[in-house]
Amino acid sequence: MAVLRPFDKLPELNSATILLVGAEGGPQQQLAEAMLREKKDFNINIHLASSLPLPSERDHLRPRIDLIAFVIDIKSKYSLKNVQASLAYVDVRFFLGKVCFLVTGVGRANNCSVEMNAIWKLGEDYCSPVIFCELELEGIRVATAQRLLRMLQICAGRVPGVSALYFSLLMRNSAGD
């Protein structure tokens, strides 16, 4: 069972890779398609996984992962438990600005199975931003795709003067401070 490491491979020229983990099915796939449709000046690789660890037999073919977005469906406790279990397979150096938690289904608060405090605690414990969205709505899905692409661009080192760690600190929740 391989642990994902952020700097174990060299970066590819004019390219960035994002790994979307969790919340199997339509919303994750639709988000990936929305990201691919956006105009960008670099190549993007999107890998989808329902959980970690990733299979090790194709590890030598997998590009360097610049950003991991853990997708949590607020309607499913299994989704949160799956993400929590997957976090054990991520090297701690990824949490220096290269991880975010994407919480979907927030438009249906009455169907909520996951406590919001658990999600906020996850973001605090792993020093990673928590992004709330509704992937079933086209406009919000496009806005989320644009936001993830900008984060990916920063995490891949394609924005001069801005590091992933610095950007992550800017996105942290300051309500508790």
Curated annotation (Swiss-Prot):
Localization per Swiss-Prot or TrEMBL: Nucleus; Chromosome, Centromere
Keywords, in A-Z order: Centromere, Chromosome, Nucleus
GO cellular component: chromosome, centromeric region; nucleus
Main location: nucleus
Keyword flag Amino-acid biosynthesis: no
InterPro entries from the UniProt entry: Centromere_Cenp-M, P-loop_NTPase
Keyword Mitochondrion belongs to the record: no
Function: Component of the CENPA-HI complex, a centromeric complex involved in assembly of kinetochore proteins, mitotic progression and chromosome segregation.
Assembly and oligomerization: Component of the CENPA-HI complex, at least composed of CENPH, CENPI, CENPK, CENPL, CENPM, CENPO and CENPP.
The protein, known as: Centromere protein M
Gene source species: Gallus gallus (Chicken)
Recorded name of the encoding gene: CENPM
